[in-house]
């Protein structure tokens, strides 16, 4: 009986000690998440904490995850201390991220800390264990020297766990979809094709490629924020990313831009700079390219800048195609104000253009006909029979 009591008491004491250790370690994980944590405050707790490397929070984060995902200014001394206590760099949380992946989402990325968090080795089965591809290139303040190190020396590439890899995107395509791509980083990525990194940096760059290029990705990924940078667009264009490139549906980068609520004429000029055919008619297909003029393809409010309209007209395309682009294919709605303004430009220049328009629009409705008549076109049986 006495022996039983002794063993029971020993068991209770052991449980209490284990609970105390767990409680202390969980407290430390919470403290590492505290924005006010400092090396001086946390050093003793880390050094005296038993089995710190074994404890994980409910999100799968170890002590390194907790600290490097903190919004504070990460202290390299704390990172070194945690590593010295055996906290794993290759531990993955419930999101599948190692501490390096968690840290790269941080707003203050430091190269020295990234170097500490990188881990790469071959196990007994000669399998490479590495976390290098966990690094997220979308960090706003990524250091250019760090980027060169990661790409050239460490061979970073899009993670196999992302849709980017499935879709075969290169680093340039991925980087331009980040919230604030920097021109100097983008330029280095574009110029880095000379390095043998084991995969293509850029895909679908040329006119013959019927798939999205980096301009398509950049414009479409910033539609919600409406935040396009002229410098980024110039950087892409100046480094052979084609403004003539068409996606799988045949759309140009400029057509992606027409869906923005606010259209900047300077960006339009960049995307039309090399004689882009914005009004091309594909054979007998009714698909027309001047989406800017067509209400169907614009967001609310639908505003039209006549200076941009003039840019479209000044291309080598015919007025007929421009006018067709104004109309909606699935309704009888027209922007008569724009039609009238466009026709005024040609009133004294070439009446044959207006005549051609009249023949094309006779079956659409008398409002369009009135606009044409008001701008100098005359009805005659001879012309109507043409």
Curated annotation (Swiss-Prot):
User: At which residues are the ANK repeats?
Assistant: 59-91, 95-126, 210-245, 249-280, 292-321, 349-381
**UniProt protein name:** Ankyrin repeat protein C17/B23
What stretches pass through the bilayer? none
Gene3D superfamilies for this protein: Ankyrin repeat-containing domain
In terms of Pfam families, this protein maps to: Ank
The source organism is Vaccinia virus (strain Copenhagen)
- Quote the InterPro entries the UniProt record gives: Ankyrin_rpt (IPR002110), Ankyrin_rpt-contain_sf (IPR036770)
Sorted UniProt keywords: ANK repeat, Repeat
């Amino acid at each position: 009986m006495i022996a039983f009591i002794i063993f029971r008491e020993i068991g209770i004491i052991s449980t209490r000690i284990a609970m105390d250790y767990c409680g202390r370690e969980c407290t430390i994980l919470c403290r590492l998440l505290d924005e006010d944590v400092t090396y001086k405050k946390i050093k003793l707790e880390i050094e005296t904490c038993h089995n710190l490397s074994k404890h994980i929070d409910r999100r799968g984060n170890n002590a390194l995850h907790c600290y490097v995902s903190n919004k504070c200014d990460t202290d390299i001394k704390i990172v070194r201390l945690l590593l010295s206590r055996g906290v794993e760099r290759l531990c993955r949380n419930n999101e599948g991220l190692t501490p390096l992946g968690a840290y790269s989402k941080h707003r203050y990325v430091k190269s020295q800390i990234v170097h500490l968090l990188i881990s790469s080795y071959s196990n007994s089965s000669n399998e490479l264990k590495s976390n290098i591809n966990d690094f997220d290139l979308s960090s706003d303040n990524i250091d250019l020297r760090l980027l060169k190190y990661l790409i050239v020396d460490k061979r970073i590439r899009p993670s196999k766990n992302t849709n980017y890899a499935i879709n075969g995107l290169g680093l340039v395509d991925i980087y331009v979809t980040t919230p604030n791509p920097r021109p100097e980083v983008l330029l280095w990525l574009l110029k880095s094709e000379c390095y043998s990194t084991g995969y293509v940096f850029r895909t679908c760059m040329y006119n013959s490629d019927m798939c999205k290029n980096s301009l398509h990705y950049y414009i479409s990924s910033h539609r919600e924020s409406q935040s396009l940078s002229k410098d980024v667009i110039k950087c892409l264009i100046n480094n052979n990313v084609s403004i003539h490139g068409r996606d799988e549906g045949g759309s140009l980068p400029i057509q992606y831009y027409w869906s923005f609520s606010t259209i900047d004429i300077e960006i339009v000029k960049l995307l039309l700079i090399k004689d882009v055919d914005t009004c091309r008619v594909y054979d007998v297909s009714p698909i027309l390219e001047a989406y800017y003029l067509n209400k169907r393809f614009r967001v609310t409010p639908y505003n039209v800048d006549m200076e941009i309209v003039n840019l479209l007209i000044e291309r080598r395309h015919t007025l007929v195609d421009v006018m067709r682009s104004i109309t909606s294919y699935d309704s009888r709605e027209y922007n008569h104000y724009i039609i009238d303004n466009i026709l005024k430009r040609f009133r004294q220049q070439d009446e044959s253009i207006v005549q051609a328009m009249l023949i094309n629009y006779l079956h659409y409705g008398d409002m369009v006909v009135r606009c044409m008549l008001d701008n100098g076109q005359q009805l005659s049986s001879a012309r109507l029979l043409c």
